[in-house]
């Protein structure tokens, strides 16, 4: 292959590293209204009265909107970026009289500059009727205090939601008699695991610009992963036709799933639609930390049974998920906690997976890389590590006995067959990379410090099977270069580059001959968006099909110009020539000119793709840590990982994806945590308080690949974006156990907890 599986530099790399104006606030007109939000100081309250009289008199203030400007009995909407009909309940109004978390919107203020808007915000007088909040998600279900008592709450999909029980979703599934299987096992691991909410903490906060175009339509430029879903959400929130809304995105300064939720779009859209003036909102870091869409807090009760020789016979999982004040992504994230962990163990005779998603008066949760699989894998993989210890077996050897193989029907994976898998090779590779044989389980350095290793494995999906759609349009221009128009969003992942590589491979042209445009709801073909590890696998396949179709058109027109049958010509990327007489040829530019100026057929193709399968990528990771038993400090000295993502379209970008995801997983394991005070107020409102690790905090990160070939993906590719975050959680927690002899069932694992446990063990 000429371009696929080659380490090309990102197309936008030079512009980004040299600081060119490419992000939203760089490219929009600066003469626009500044929009800011007055937020609730209470976790649960009704706005009794709100007085904006003095605030409206501040010079420069254009408008102030409150709940009185929004019909409270109107149909509600969701901010979740999901294919219609959304699984997430429609439970929001633009401004609701009932505020449900500290940070919920009370008023929208728009003015000519930040100074006047900030002044007006301070002059708004609000009287609240403070209500008892639901702050403990363990007691939320069937609590007499309802987070959503309203009658216009609506669930479009049968996900087991019931707002009168504080239930955002409930589900049960299984196969076999799990209780009988566990009763017959030699060993049963039975524990409850708890993962906290954590923030995506992307460098570019939420931001949106809105204006009215010549035709009276609402134009939205937003840092979003989901232009088409955002368009629908905005139209639903404003109760206007979808045809009156256009959404486009500039370069995105990171998302990690946060921008799969339309967190900021509705507010300037509301202002612009009402005032007919352009406006923008840029979330502060405080707002992005305290009023955004963090990972769902989850608690997982795992019962895992095995024979004495290490064969896993059954897995019983109950997950309780905290969706917070609103239900964005609640019903779908919880599903992945089981459906992306249980299938790893293909020899299991029975499984049961039950889940509840509950409303509380915490910040609304959302999508974050890993999307529920991260939480479930921590629980299941930690249980497997404990099983290996109890059986005195090597954790790698135990997994090699149990892992799902290519051709297996995967348990808890909707009856799907494992169509491609190199998980066994990944296990062997990582064991060698970390030098497991010589380092496992631990080495006491004799100075209060212990070095130890631990491991875990993971899977994810490649798009949402049978639901999400990828599309691409390709057209040949008059001088022989191509325009690739997509609806997927490059949020720093490099998908513009990888999709161009796929097109260039099919069309036999240099990568620089592919110009990529998107995403824009008016000009791009429909695409569900960049989430669910779908872009390379789903939109990439659409791009491959589209390029094949355009190639056929080029050959057909070239043959027509040559006066011979289409099956008698070949195309080498530069010329169409007769197979039997290569000297008889037409250049690509000649064919393009004939198409455009010769009034012949347009050389343009559009293809759409959705896959009936979501083939899992796999990953194995191993960590070496150094634990100071006196202070509890943990240093990650080395993290080695091996990924099966099918064919890596761009190995360099794939490796960078893996390294970044591993760093996020390390942060979730050791430092990152969204906490609240006793009144429900978030406590980490800055990057000084919310501690995300940087590259210099971690030692060596080594990533290798063991490639399978996925016949349903473009050139054999599967996804890479999310699976990479999942292995640090079980690997590091197991390494800490091997160092001090205490298992931790809750994340993050803090130095205080480690030091106290180590001291207790040495009494």
PLM features: residue spans?
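Flexible, low-hydrophobicity surface segments
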Residues: 1-162, 274
């Amino acid at each position: 292959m000429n371009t696929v599986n080659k380490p090309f530099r990102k197309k936008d790399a030079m512009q980004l590293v040299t600081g060119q104006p490419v992000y939203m606030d760089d490219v929009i007109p600066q003469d626009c209204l500044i929009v800011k939000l007055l937020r609730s100081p209470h976790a649960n309250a009704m706005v009794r009265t709100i007085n904006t009289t003095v605030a409206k008199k501040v010079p420069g203030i254009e408008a102030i909107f409150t709940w009185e400007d929004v019909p409270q009995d109107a149909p509600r909407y969701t901010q979740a970026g999901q294919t219609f009909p959304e699984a997430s309940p429609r439970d929001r109004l633009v401004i609701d009289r009932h505020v449900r978390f500290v940070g919920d919107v009370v008023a929208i203020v728009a003015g000519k500059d930040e100074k006047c808007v900030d002044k007006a915000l301070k002059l708004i007088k609000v009287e609240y009727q403070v209500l008892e909040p639901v702050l403990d998600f363990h007691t939320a279900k069937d609590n007499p205090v309802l987070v959503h008592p309203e009658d216009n709450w609506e669930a479009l999909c049968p996900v087991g939601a019931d707002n009168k029980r504080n239930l955002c979703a409930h589900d049960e599934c299984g196969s076999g008699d799990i209780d009988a299987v566990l009763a017959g096992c030699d060993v049963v691991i039975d524990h409850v695991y708890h993962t906290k909410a954590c923030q995506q903490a992307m460098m570019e906060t939420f931001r949106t610009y809105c204006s009215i175009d010549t035709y009276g339509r609402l134009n939205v430029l937003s840092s979003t992963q989901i232009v088409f879903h955002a368009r629908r959400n905005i139209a639903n929130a404003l109760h206007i036709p979808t045809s009156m809304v256009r959404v486009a995105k500039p370069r995105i300064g990171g998302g990690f799933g946060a921008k799969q939720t339309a967190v900021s779009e509705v507010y300037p859209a509301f202002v612009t639609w009402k005032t007919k003036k352009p406006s923008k909102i840029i979330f502060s870091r405080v707002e992005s930390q305290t009023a955004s869409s963090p990972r769902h807090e989850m608690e997982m009760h795992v019962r895992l049974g095995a024979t004495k020789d290490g064969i896993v016979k059954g897995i019983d999982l109950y997950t309780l998920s905290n969706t917070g004040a609103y239900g964005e992504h609640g019903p779908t994230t919880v599903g992945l906690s089981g459906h992306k962990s249980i299938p790893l163990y293909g020899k299991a005779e029975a499984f049961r997976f039950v889940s509840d998603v509950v409303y509380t008066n915490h910040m609304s949760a959302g999508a974050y890389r890993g999307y529920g699989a991260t939480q479930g894998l921590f629980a299941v993989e930690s249980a497997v590590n404990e099983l290996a210890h109890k059986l005195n077996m090597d954790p790698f050897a135990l997994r090699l006995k149990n892992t799902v193989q290519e051709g297996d029907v995967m348990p808890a994976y909707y009856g799907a067959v494992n169509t491609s898998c190199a998980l066994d090779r990944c296990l062997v590779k990582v064991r060698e990379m970390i030098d497991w044989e010589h380092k496992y389980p631990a080495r006491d350095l004799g100075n209060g410090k212990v070095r130890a290793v631990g491991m875990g494995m993971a899977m994810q999906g490649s798009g949402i099977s049978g639901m999400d759609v990828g599309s691409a349009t390709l057209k040949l221009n008059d001088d022989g270069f191509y325009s690739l128009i997509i609806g997927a969003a490059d949020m720093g992942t490099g998908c513009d580059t990888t999709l161009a590589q796929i097109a260039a491979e099919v069309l036999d042209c240099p990568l620089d001959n592919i110009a990529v445009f998107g995403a824009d709801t008016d000009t791009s073909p429909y695409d569900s968006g960049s989430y669910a590890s779908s872009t390379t696998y789903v939109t990439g396949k659409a791009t491959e099909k589209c390029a094949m179709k355009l190639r056929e058109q080029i050959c057909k027109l070239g043959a027509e110009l040559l006066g011979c049958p289409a099956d008698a010509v070949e195309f080498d990327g530069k010329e169409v020539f007769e197979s039997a007489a290569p000297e008889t040829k037409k250049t690509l530019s000649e064919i393009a000119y004939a198409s455009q100026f010769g009034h012949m057929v347009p050389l343009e193709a559009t293809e759409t793709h959705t896959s009936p399968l979501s083939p899992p990528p796999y990953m194995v990771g191993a960590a070496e840590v150094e634990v100071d038993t006196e202070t509890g400090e943990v240093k990650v000295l080395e993290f080695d990982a091996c990924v099966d993502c099918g064919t890596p379209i761009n190995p360099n970008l794939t490796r960078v994806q893996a390294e970044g995801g591993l760093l996020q997983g390390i942060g979730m394991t050791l430092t990152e945590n969204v906490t609240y005070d006793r009144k429900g107020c978030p406590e980490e409102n800055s990057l000084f308080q919310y501690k995300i690790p940087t590259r210099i905090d971690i030692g060596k990160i080594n990533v290798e690949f063991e490639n399978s070939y996925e016949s349903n993906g473009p050139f054999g590719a599967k996804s890479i974006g999310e699976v990479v975050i999942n292995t640090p959680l079980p690997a590091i927690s197991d390494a800490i156990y091997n160092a001090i002899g205490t298992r931790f069932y809750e994340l993050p694992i803090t130095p205080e907890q480690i030091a106290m446990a180590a001291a207790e063990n040495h009494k």
